[in-house]
């Protein structure tokens, strides 16, 4: 959530930055008008309360002197009624302010490229060279079925579209991947966490999913629970409402969890395969950092995600997302896209973001600065390290062989009992 004081004191800058994210100045002007009205009413309310206190003292004195205080009592009753009316108007304005400010996205960092959509993202670097095949390659969904390791037909029967069963060495490959990812992040100083897979509405608000993106989630009916769309939500909210010791920062968390997404608005996109599912595993990284260190931590987090792809020897590229393509809470985001041979393109496999104090303000996560003793909002960061199903897709396609088999990447073999190949039965 943006700082209302910042909007008030630096309106033009905030308006200019949000315009690059598609926010009209009209909504900001309305917010500014409401804020000004609110401040005027607060002044009026305080003045009336001060007058009422004086009147109350005068009435008490008149009664002690056995003087008639009926006029003063009537005036005080009118003041009380006026205060009540102002308080009611303030509550109404506060509600309107909340409605606007809670759906405004974060302001982009100065280094973020300005653009409308994914076409305006800027490629930063590439790693690895896409393999040249001398045979007709298969898509990962065909490989999965031919190798008897992925079953979409029964997934659709048991649940519905965009669900599947992993089986045999497919299940083991998935498990090997997330164990490998967690182990790699642990080496980099991340604390491993097993989170709840349901959170309450306050947690969804804290990380910015609620109220704006409610339609993208799976809520449990007649409850305060939501299935997590990412482990970012429980990990970030771990410290919601707390004050941390500055000397303990940065704090790094990692967790593997299922992620549940309704994929509202994705009809017709990636209807086959592992790219877009309602339920998938993802290894998440979350950091809590001091403001002056958060962009250095973003580079480290991105490197941690890249490390996984490099050790798996999967070609990828890194993009700096433009203002029009960034997520709601992000101030800056790097996307990692892995090479998918059957689609002859790179597809997103990780997104690493610095939200600055946007989530911390919503979730009230603060730290005590050891330098001056003051309590301040910290910065939160989050990143995929990696989306496991998409990594399975990338391995199946990049490591496929002419005979229909798939070679298991060397770093995963210790996690798969030494198996080197997934072969057709």
UniProtKB/Swiss-Prot annotation:
Stored CDD domains: SerRS_core
Signal sequence coordinates: none
Keywords on record: Aminoacyl-tRNA synthetase, ATP-binding, Cytoplasm, Ligase, Nucleotide-binding, Protein biosynthesis
Annotated positions binding L-serine: 230-232, 284, 384
An example Gene Ontology molecular-function term: transferase activity
Catalytic reactions of this protein: tRNA(Ser) + L-serine + ATP = L-seryl-tRNA(Ser) + AMP + diphosphate + H(+); tRNA(Sec) + L-serine + ATP = L-seryl-tRNA(Sec) + AMP + diphosphate + H(+)
Residues reported in the UniProt entry to bind ATP: 261-263, 348-351
GO terms, biological process: selenocysteine biosynthetic process; seryl-tRNA aminoacylation
EC number, UniProt record: 6.1.1.11
Disulphide bonds in the chain: none
Pfam families hit by this protein: Seryl_tRNA_N, tRNA-synt_2b
Main location: cytoplasm
Enzyme class: ligase
A single GO cellular-component term on record: cytoplasm
Pathway assignment: Aminoacyl-tRNA biosynthesis; selenocysteinyl-tRNA(Sec) biosynthesis; L-seryl-tRNA(Sec) from L-serine and tRNA(Sec): step 1/1
Keyword Lyase annotated: no
Subunit organization: Homodimer. The tRNA molecule binds across the dimer.
Family assignment from sequence similarity: Belongs to the class-II aminoacyl-tRNA synthetase family. Type-1 seryl-tRNA synthetase subfamily.
Known function: Catalyzes the attachment of serine to tRNA(Ser). Is also able to aminoacylate tRNA(Sec) with serine, to form the misacylated tRNA L-seryl-tRNA(Sec), which will be further converted into selenocysteinyl-tRNA(Sec).
Alphabetical list of PANTHER family matching this protein: SERINE--TRNA LIGASE, SERYL-TRNA SYNTHETASE
Domain notes: Consists of two distinct domains, a catalytic core and a N-terminal extension that is involved in tRNA binding.
The name this protein goes by in its record: Serine--tRNA ligase
